[in-house]
């Protein structure tokens, strides 16, 4: 269908790698819809040419920054300010209906059935389920809606300093009016939710259609071993509880995206791709040899407590589920 599209956004060359993997995963699962990507002037001309190979339409837009630095600081994610550029997706009136997907999402199955949904359809946010997560949503492009969103952005801003707060303010009836607009969680499976509700993931995770790599560390920031075809563990990263989704991301990246980047001179060759700052200062590593063992520094109980309170628990080490269970067992005996 030429009047419907999957839409994503990249504001720099680092996120463009995510967009390339997303687009490749949509094609891999044989979508019949067009693919469009919004880019900002910060995306290099060379990377834009690479995007044009995967996407049917590459559209440059001006950055609309919320400027809400206090809220962004509170969220510890100041880069989210520029994601208000997502509002431009409502101006794509050449399409009758679209599905927006963040560049840090990955498609695991055909999801063309999302176009049967109405605006605004989205999955609950794992942090506050009465709000929807704006990483995946169905919408209908409209100049009127676009202008109304700009007005809300200007007059009210965003309660979280990013696009999700603004969109939840605008579509404020999502939580209560129509359950049909609540997408199942499998259409926007948060990678950080896997650890927090492991039993549900074990029961339903096999049905996941889209995984969303929330958090500061993105798939392209990890180290990948081409021999084992697996991502190296990163200490207390909860995403590594079930790294299979990261491995799928990297498999698509190495087989479909790296050759494209090589074609445009963004990387020289696979063998020299270890520890190379290939695009816009963002490092993607391919570990071609032995992965050196790392020793974890000693952390006092007070430091551990402080890290817990800041949401930085060592999920893969001292604060793993098995270690917590052992500690609880000593008290219950």
UniProtKB/Swiss-Prot annotation:
UniProt keyword list: Acetylation, Cytoplasm, Glycogen biosynthesis, Glycoprotein, Manganese, Metal-binding, Nucleus, Phosphoprotein, Transferase
Cellular component aspect of the GO annotation: cytoplasm; nucleus
Binding-site list for UDP: 9, 11-12, 15, 77, 102-104, 212, 215, 218
Pathway as given in its UniProt record: Glycan biosynthesis; glycogen biosynthesis
GO terms for MF: glycogenin glucosyltransferase activity; manganese ion binding; protein homodimerization activity
Modification Phosphoserine, positions: 44
Entry-linked InterPro entries: Glyco_trans_8 (IPR002495), GNT1/Glycosyltrans_8 (IPR050587), Nucleotide-diphossugar_trans (IPR029044)
Main location: cytoplasm
Residues noted as binding UDP-alpha-D-glucose in the record, renumbered to the chain: 9, 11-12, 15, 77, 86, 102-104, 133-134, 160, 163-164, 215, 218
Residues the UniProt record annotates as site (Important for catalytic activity): 86
Compartments, record wording: Cytoplasm; Nucleus
Pfam families in the record: Glyco_transf_8
GO biological process, one term: glycogen biosynthetic process
Keyword Phosphoprotein: yes
Enzyme Commission numbers on file: 2.4.1.186
Binding site for Mn(2+): 102, 104, 212
Recorded family membership: Belongs to the glycosyltransferase 8 family. Glycogenin subfamily.
Self-association state and partner proteins as the record states: Part of the GYS1-GYG1 complex, a heterooctamer composed of a tetramer of GYS1 and 2 dimers of GYG1, where each GYS1 protomer binds to one GYG1 subunit (via GYG1 C-terminus); the GYS1 tetramer may dissociate from GYG1 dimers to continue glycogen polymerization on its own. May also form a heterooctamer complex with GYS2 (via GYG1 C-terminus).
General function of this protein: Glycogenin participates in the glycogen biosynthetic process along with glycogen synthase and glycogen branching enzyme. It catalyzes the formation of a short alpha (1,4)-glucosyl chain covalently attached via a glucose 1-O-tyrosyl linkage to internal tyrosine residues and these chains act as primers for the elongation reaction catalyzed by glycogen synthase.
The protein, known as: Glycogenin-1
Organism, scientific name: Oryctolagus cuniculus (Rabbit)
Lineage: Eukaryota, Metazoa, Chordata, Craniata, Vertebrata
Gene: GYG1
